[in-house]
Every structure is written in structure tokens, then in C-alpha cells.
A protein has these predicted regions:
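Non-catalytic nucleic-acid substrate-recognition regions in nucleic-acid-modifying enzymes
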Residues: 1-130
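A structural signal for short, well-ordered beta-strand segments and their strand-loop junctions
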Residues: 87, 144-146, 190
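Short loop/turn segments at secondary-structure transitions that flank enzyme active sites
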Residues: 38, 94, 142, 151, ...
């Protein structure tokens, strides 16, 4: 589960309350175990999460050919149809693969080539709202391939009016409130409210409301074949 730096312990507490197991904090992320129903629940209820990724494959690659071959072996047809849409996000950390965009392109090529060989047709690329968003994390030779169950970042709650200048990130606001140890029975005052993000997030917290209940674009998992 991805989050902002400094909010890992806060997110771990939320995950524990939501029933997740085997919780372990990392850097800008918290790892846990849950079932598919839990994935749905976490996307809806977590206030300090940015994305919820489901790892499906780990492997090692020394070069672009090995990377392509390993990606092509993944049974992508389980996760998206040949008539669907995909997007690939990648993070590169290390000396072997230095460009995340290149990893994303090789992954995309492997996915569409697998579909062509199996079905003679391929998914199209859709950057904003794909049926399947693929996340690839690289550290030196090691790769972790995950499915992004959130779709778009979970800070996009759905209540903000477009056009506000320098708005406060909703996940950051929710984390600030929890770190402040605010007593929910006391009044909450924001004298420099701007777009009102702190007040809205405080309202969600005080009334124990699911912060992502009103997301306009929904969640990535809602476009998966098994949903």
C-alpha cells in the first residue's frame, strides 16, 4: 500500500483497524496481507493510502531481452481482455535499468505481443482510466510486477472542485489530522482553510465515513474480469 513519506505508521494503524494481516512498514509504503474482499474494503476506507498494489510476479532480469521474456510469460489474459485497455507505471532504481519509461515500454510490448500471439488482437493503451493499470518496480536485477487495484491515486476523493490553486493533498491532510491526535469530540478549526481540505477530511474522520465513497472515477478493480 503506497503512501506519503512520514505517514507509514499512520497507515499501518489504519490497516490494522481494517483487518489486514502481516503488516510491515517500508519507505512510503506499508505491506500487508488480505483477501480480494479486503482489497475492495481498503480502497474504500483508507484515508492515508495513495494506491493499493497487488503483487503477482517477481523475477530477476539482467538485460532488456530477459525483461521482455519474463513479462511475456505472465498470463495477462487472466487480468484484462484483448479488447480492453492497459497502462504501465514503472519505477527504476539501480545501475542496470536506469529509465523507468523504457521499462514501461518493454512491459507494454510484451503484453501486447502475448495477446497478438494468442488472440490475433491486442489491448490498447489508455493512460488515464485503463481497464488494467500495471505497476512495475525495479531494484537492480529484481522486478516486482503488481496490479494497481486503485486505478487512479486515492487522494482523488471526488469532492474537490477543479481549478483550486495549490490545493493541499487529501492524503496529506488526513495524515496531518491523525498525527495531531485531535479529539473528535472537540471542535475543529482551520483559520486558513483555502479549499477546505482539512475541514472535509476532519469531517470524514469525525463521523467515521469512508473517505473514498464519493470517487467519481471509481476504482481500478471495478474494471477487472473477476469483479
Amino acid at each position: 500500500v503506497k503512501t506519503l513519506a512520514g505517514l507509514e505508521e499512520v497507515l499501518a494503524g489504519e490497516l490494522q483497524q481494517a483487518g489486514a494481516l502481516q503488516i510491515e512498514t517500508g519507505t512510503r509504503a506499508v505491506f500487508c496481507e488480505t483477501d480480494l474482499e479486503g482489497v475492495y474494503r481498503l480502497n474504500l476506507c483508507l484515508s492515508t493510502a495513495l494506491r493499493i498494489l497487488i503483487p503477482i510476479v517477481t523475477f530477476e532480469a539482467e538485460n532488456e531481452t530477459e525483461l521482455y521474456d519474463c513479462m511475456k510469460e505472465i498470463p495477462w489474459e487472466k487480468y484484462v481482455s484483448s479488447k480492453g485497455t492497459i497502462a504501465v507505471d514503472a519505477i527504476a532504481q539501480g545501475e542496470i535499468f536506469r529509465h523507468s519509461h523504457y521499462i514501461a515500454l518493454k512491459t507494454k510490448d510484451a503484453v501486447v505481443d502475448r495477446f497478438r500471439s494468442l488472440f490475433q488482437e491486442r489491448p490498447n493503451v489508455e493512460v488515464q482510466f485503463p481497464d488494467l493499470r500495471i505497476n512495475v518496480h525495479n531494484q537492480d536485477r529484481a522486478f516486482t510486477v503488481s496490479l494497481d487495484s486503485s486505478g487512479t491515486s486515492l487522494h482523488r476523493r471526488g469532492y474537490r472542485v477543479d481549478g483550486e490553486e495549490a490545493p493541499l493533498n487529501e492524503v496529506l491532510a488526513a495524515g496531518m489530522i491523525r498525527l495531531s491526535q485531535w479529539n473528535r469530540d472537540c471542535p475543529f478549526v482551520d483559520p486558513m482553510c483555502g479549499s477546505g481540505t482539512l475541514l472535509i477530511e476532519a469531517g470524514f474522520y469525525a463521523h467515521q465515513m469512508a473517505p473514498n465513497k464519493y470517487r467519481k472515477e471509481g476504482f481500478g478493480f471495478q474494471r477487472w474480469p473477476n469483479y
